[in-house]
Amino acid sequence: MSQAQYAGTGRRKNAVARVRLVPGTGKITVNKKDVEEYIPHADLRLVINQPFAVTSTAGSYDVFVNVVGGGYAGQAGAIRHGIARALLQVDPDFRDSLKRAGLLTRDSRKVERKKPGLKKARKASQFSKR
């Protein structure tokens, strides 16, 4: 009863998602909860399903995700990245379409740190010449 399993790790902002793909019906489970329950925003659920839409594999794999860190948007991006990487293991021919859609590229943008003497990362108090 050993089924083929495909794994991928995705990252976005401060979120890290470990993704497992198992041939199945298309059910997505995030941290042992259904995806509709875990991620309340419909637009973020669309983000998660992008790799399946690009490769026309929607509904053919069950997805099991363990995600930590970040907020809803960062976690959704990390899950998307992990699913795209796992789909590469399913079929290496998916690389071209996933790369063209920008799903394999790690989005390296992070929150810039606050600097001392400034109000935020770049916001300074108003400058007075005299």
From Swiss-Prot:
It comes from the Bacteria. InterPro entries: Ribosomal_Su5_D2-typ_SF, Ribosomal_uS9, Ribosomal_uS9_bac/plastid, Ribosomal_uS9_CS, Ribsml_uS5_D2-typ_fold_subgr. Residues 107-130 are annotated as: Disordered. Keywords: Ribonucleoprotein, Ribosomal protein. Residues 111-130 have a biased composition (Basic residues). The keyword Ribosomal protein applies. Belongs to the universal ribosomal protein uS9 family. This is Small ribosomal subunit protein uS9.
